[in-house]
Every structure is written in C-alpha cells, then in structure tokens.
Amino acid sequence: YEVVVEELFTNVQQLSMEVESVHLDGQQLVNDAVSMLDRVATTQLTDEETSYAFAHIYDVKANTEAVEEIVKIFMSRADTQKAANVTEKLAVLNDTIAYYEVGKEDYVNYSYFTSKQKEELIAAISDVRDALKEMNSSLK
C-alpha cells in the first residue's frame, strides 16, 4: 500500500501545482456558455433526428443550471441592468422547462412538442443567450 499512497500523494501534489497555474478568463467562460446555448437552440432542438428527443429537455435543464452557476460567479463583475436581464431571462426559461416537467425531474419527450412549443422553448433559450452576450460585454 505504501507505493500506492506515495504515488497518490505525488499525483495530488503535482495536480495542486498545475491548478495554481490555471487562469480562468471570465469573458471566455461566459462566451462558452453562450456557445453552449447557441448549440442547443440552433442545432440540437432544430435537428430532425428524434432518436435522442427523450433527452433534449434534460439537456436543456442541465445547460440552464450550468449557465446559472456561471452567472452567479460573474454577476458582480457585470453591469447591474445586464446581469438582472440575464436573471430575468433565466427565470422565463426555467418556467418554460418547468411547464414540461412530469413528476420529479422527469420531462415530456421533446418529440411530442408542437411546433409552437418548440419555438417557445428555442426563443426562451435564445433570449438567455442574447442577454448573456450583453452581460459579457460589460464584464469588468
């Protein structure tokens, strides 16, 4: 066991040193969140492929939660109005997602959505994406 413990200790020390040298750029992280939402709104939800439709809303919810965490981190560095706009748009998106929730953390299969429902969800995602872009331009 001593060899394994020593190797683990060495690896943890090395990782610790590497983590100290990582620089996270706020604007890049917010840009990544914008890109993530853009992919969902313009590719995933508009794709005619239905074999993964059962998972689309789960993916939208996970992406929304990730964006919320990024916004929490950088909200204090952004213009107050622009940050509030993102929060507002996220609330609308969360309400839209919640409408399709069935039970606890289960969702209606996206393939059952009407065209109008799909458009509403995509619009809510796009609104968050656009608000994030605006917030990102104001990061200090």
Predicted feature residues:
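Mature extracytoplasmic or organellar-lumen-exposed domains after removal of signal/transit peptides
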Residues: Y1-K140
